[in-house]
Amino acid sequence: MTADKEKKRSSSELRKEKSRDAARCRRSKETEVFYELAHELPLPHSVSSHLDKASIMRLAISFLRTHKLLSSVCSENESEAEADQQMDNLYLKALEGFIAVVTQDGDMIFLSENISKFMGLTQVELTGHSIFDFTHPCDHEEIRENLTLKTGSGFGKKNKDRSTERDFFMRMKCTVTNRGRTVNLKSATWKVLHCTGQVRVYNNCPPHSSLCGYKEPLLSCLIIMCEPIQHPSHMDIPLDSKTFLSRHSMDMKFTYCDDRILELVGYHPEELLGRSAYEFYHALDSENMTKSHQNLCTKGQVVSGQYRMLAKHGGYVWLETQGTVVYNPRNLQPQCIMCVNYVLSEIEKNDVVVSMDQTESCSSHTLMAMNSIFDTSDDVALSEKSNYLFTNLKEEPEDLAQLAPTPGDAIISLDFGSQNFDESSTYGKAILPPGQPWATELRSHSAQSESRSLPAFTVPQAGSPGNATPSATSSSSCSTPSSPEDYYSSLENHLKIEVIEKLFAMDTEAKDQCSTQTDFNELDLETLAPYIPMDGEDFQLSPICPEEPLVPESPQPNPQHCFSTMSSIFQPLTPGASQGTFFLDKYPQQLESRKTESEHWPMSTIFFDAGSKGSLPPCCGQASTPLSSMGGRSNTPWPPDPPLHLGPTKWSVGNQSAEPLGPLPLGTSQLEPPSTPPHVSMFKMRSAKDFGARGPYMMSPAMIALSNKLKLKRQLDYEEPAFQDTSGGDPPGTSSSHLMWKRMKSLMGGTCPLMPDKTVSASMAPDEFTQKSMRGLGQPLRHLPPSQPPSTRSPGENAKSGFPPQCYASPFQDYSPPGAQKGSGVASRLLGPSFEPYLLPELTRYDCEVNVPEPGSSTLLQGRDLLRALDQAT
């Protein structure tokens, strides 16, 4: 039994050994056959000896198909010479790409050996493989369209022959880096290849062989040359003189251009910036350039075909452009387009104009010829040049538009000669004599006469040196014409340039002491920052404007000045200026004389010394001129001011130095400007600083708001009796003036310029201080009888103030308050009855500074800033 088992094992092992030997023999024979086949391939021995069987079969099949293609394409009689064999090696070196042959199924049956130079992949690695394994998936559809004969965009005959020309772009895997290194296929990047070639059709079998009458279908393959597009940043070879660089935005607008375009095409680089490249393409090439732009945005690189770019002076040049999209390294978003433009020809057909830009360029040559006419350096007679210019302008009338001067240019008269033109008698009537100056020169020397000849918009208003009362009419140092005809002179029909310049000119600085005339016409009161009170009560801005006509007293108009800056409306008002102009404008019938009287009233001159010592000039303005905000055009007038009475009114500190606001009844005695008592001279400097029109400090917005509130309350107080007659009752100063002084003390505190210094004796004459307060508060003088000045004042002392006597009237006589009031002190003043039905908010300087507008702006504290400022104040 054991022997039989051993025999069976030996026989099975022998059969296995024989089978293994047979398989080994077959494999060795196959290997020999494959190696023999590999040696038959047109490959170096070092390459073919390391090929596997699959690669050998793949390469052999590709070789056979390529040979069949060549045999069908080339004729049998053609014999390859030795010279042609030598040239084959030079072809690959000269080409800037590689050659590929792709079947209609997508198999690459042939690739030139220089493909490794551009793509990093060798010829053996790619030959026999499908092209779809190494190209971008987004390009597969386009590749299939170009592999077949059904579709294609070429130059074949329409409706007769199918187009076989191919020109497209595809992205293929590249394993070579910019530095020349070769990476793995998994780390390969995409490189754009410009593929140009044609589709060739050939028979699978030779023509003489037939298989029982059966004909195999025709085979087709695509023979293309693939050229990679070099990145502009990787160019090592310098550009020649026929090449220029340009940079564009993504919509092909020029952002940079090389200077060489000036010599090649004629454009200056500055002329192209911001303009689209499509403006310079020939109309016949616009479709191809649009397609190239689409490929550029899709694939990142493109090479345009040969196209025509319009030259500047007519004609065109042939160009070819390589475009590359530059991406932002941070977010990988397209940033710009870099173009390398190769000029392929000189300017062709430079006499053909196909663009409007070229017409402008051509007209520039004519203009250059025109400019040479005015060149006096040539020896050619001026008449000949004029004749030449006249001929050119007659042939090309459109060139006259190029000669039109721009505003500010010097106007050069064209002299065409007298033989070509007859002087018209129409223009001879308005020509000035040779020795007589032009009307513009006459106007420059006679500005005073113009102001009288054109008085329609001119409202002369003369004021004192401290006069800063806002005016509702526009007044300037120059006259403003009232109609369009006034802008022209009577002698010629030219514009009055000086009048127009003065019309739009504004003085930025005051030229003299009478230049602080403000103008509400040029102001937008809504943009002015209002005062925000601390107690929540709002004060509206009320305009102050003259309504009744004024009677000019001085025959010579004083120089006027327009309102210069917006912030000057907050300038402090001087005594006799804040309400003085208003008083003079509203009640001019009491201002018929300006004689200085020897009688004066016992009032402090701290309300007058801030201004000039000279007499007040008359106000010669037309008070009925309406307020205008449309460049001097008359529109809605302001309402007239109601008459004022000394009733329970709300006084503004900013008007303490103002003029009396009440009208003087007929028969009222004239007033005298007061003199300065010795014990109140210490307040002159402070009053002048706080209330002077030329002072450095501006009035607080609170004062302006309170002054405007006074205007609103006049209407309410109009029906109330103002004062009882002094002949039938107690003097009004015995009670009201003292209470008003208490009110002023509670309002101003220590910051009021009217507050007496603590060092001053309490037994000082209260009538002087009270009358000073009443004088500053602008009490009306309507219902007051004339009063006689005290005998304690000397005429010489009172003559120091040179103000017109008829402009001022004191409603009080010389008196002294009761002793109980004088000795009660501050407590009794605070606890005493109020002169008014309600109290004004007591504002500190810090509260006013919080809400005062910033210089040069109208921004107020709002929101958190206002709350923060209020917290700091508390």
Curated annotation (Swiss-Prot):
The modification Phosphothreonine is found at T844. GO terms for molecular function: cis-regulatory region sequence-specific DNA binding; cobalt ion binding; DNA binding; DNA-binding transcription activator activity, RNA polymerase II-specific; DNA-binding transcription factor activity; DNA-binding transcription factor activity, RNA polymerase II-specific; protein heterodimerization activity; RNA polymerase II cis-regulatory region sequence-specific DNA binding. Residues 1-23, 440-487, 624-677, 777-824 are annotated as: Disordered. Residues 84-154, 230-300 form the PAS domain. In normoxia, is probably hydroxylated on Pro-405 and Pro-530 by EGLN1/PHD1, EGLN2/PHD2 and/or EGLN3/PHD3. The hydroxylated prolines promote interaction with VHL, initiating rapid ubiquitination and subsequent proteasomal degradation. Under hypoxia, proline hydroxylation is impaired and ubiquitination is attenuated, resulting in stabilization. Residues 26-53 are annotated as: DNA-binding. This is Endothelial PAS domain-containing protein 1. It comes from Rattus norvegicus. The gene is Epas1.
